């Protein structure tokens, strides 16, 4: 939008006012913002300006958009300590959040080239590929691809995979996650993950890649996770 030289653009002023209301607690986690039309009336401006203000707040991780429902104040981020042996469901409950995992697909397929080496497989070996969506308090926060070894977990697809995979491993195979190699870095949200999470393709995301080991020190599976950029923080205490 045009502005007088030296003046702060109106969309930044509106962003600052909304940000102040969020940070002061006047707008709390999970609160719904007024509609774009209502915000136009409140700030006496155009919808284009309001949308720019909202986009700035979304990029900052302060608000998020739910399809056909509007804009909401972003919940507090889940925090992950990579030194702790935990799983998504346990992590959520320990932080007072309600977890849910939904299985999108589960197939026996040829191992993708990019995970062949860490899983110690050969070309054309088979894996179970699970694609799952994880929710915290009803909000989709993570798109996960689980690459599982049929030799370690035969007939895996016969079980209910809409919950904790950790519990399935323990109850049906007597296998326990005990250690992992974790890498994480920012990336752009790929198309399939973006569609599942309800965000635009190419939006910022946090990618976590975990190579998991069981109680015998053997490779168990490999997870590739795409997290919404506003839903997770990683903390490590080295004391």
UniProtKB/Swiss-Prot annotation:
Q: Which GO terms describe its molecular function?
A: DNA binding; DNA-binding transcription factor activity
**What would be one Pfam family of this protein?**
UTRA
The alphabetical list of record keywords is: DNA-binding, Transcription, Transcription regulation
Description of what induces expression: Induced when inorganic phosphate is limiting; this is controlled by PhoB.
The alphabetized list of GO BP terms reads: negative regulation of DNA-templated transcription
Carries keyword Nucleotide-binding? Answer: no
Q: Does the keyword DNA-binding apply?
A: yes
Residues within the DNA-binding region(s): 36-55
Residue ranges occupied by any HTH gntR-type domain in the UniProt entry: 8-76
UniProt miscellaneous comment: Maps to a phosphate-starvation-inducible locus previously known as PsiC.
Name of this chain's protein = Putative transcriptional regulator of 2-aminoethylphosphonate degradation operons
- Organism annotation: Salmonella typhimurium (strain LT2 / SGSC1412 / ATCC 700720)
């Amino acid at each position: 939008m045009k502005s007088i030289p030296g003046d702060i653009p109106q969309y930044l002023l509106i962003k600052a006012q909304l940000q102040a209301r969020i940070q002061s607690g006047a707008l709390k986690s999970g609160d719904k913002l007024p509609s774009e039309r209502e915000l136009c009336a409140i700030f006496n401006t155009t919808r284009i300006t309001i949308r720019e203000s909202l986009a700035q707040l979304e990029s900052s991780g302060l608000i998020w958009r739910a399809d056909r429902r509007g804009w909401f104040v972003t919940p507090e981020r889940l925090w992950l300590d990579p030194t702790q042996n935990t799983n998504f469901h346990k992590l959520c409950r320990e932080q007072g959040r309600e977890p849910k995992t939904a299985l999108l697909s589960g197939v026996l397929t040829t191992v993708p080239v990019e995970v062949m080496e860490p899983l110690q497989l050969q070309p054309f070996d088979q894996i179970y590929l699970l694609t799952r969506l994880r929710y915290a308090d009803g909000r989709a926060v993570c798109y996960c691809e689980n690459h599982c070894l049929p030799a370690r977990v035969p007939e895996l697809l016969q079980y209910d995979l809409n919950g904790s995979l950790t519990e399935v491993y323990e109850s049906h195979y007597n296998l326990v996650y005990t250690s992992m190699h974790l890498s994480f870095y920012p990336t752009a949200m790929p198309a399939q993950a973006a569609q599942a999470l309800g965000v635009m393709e190419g939006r910022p995301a946090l990618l976590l890649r975990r190579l998991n080991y069981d109680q015998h020190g053997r490779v168990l599976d490999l997870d590739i996770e795409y997290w919404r950029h506003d839903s997770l923080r990683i903390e490590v205490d080295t004391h």
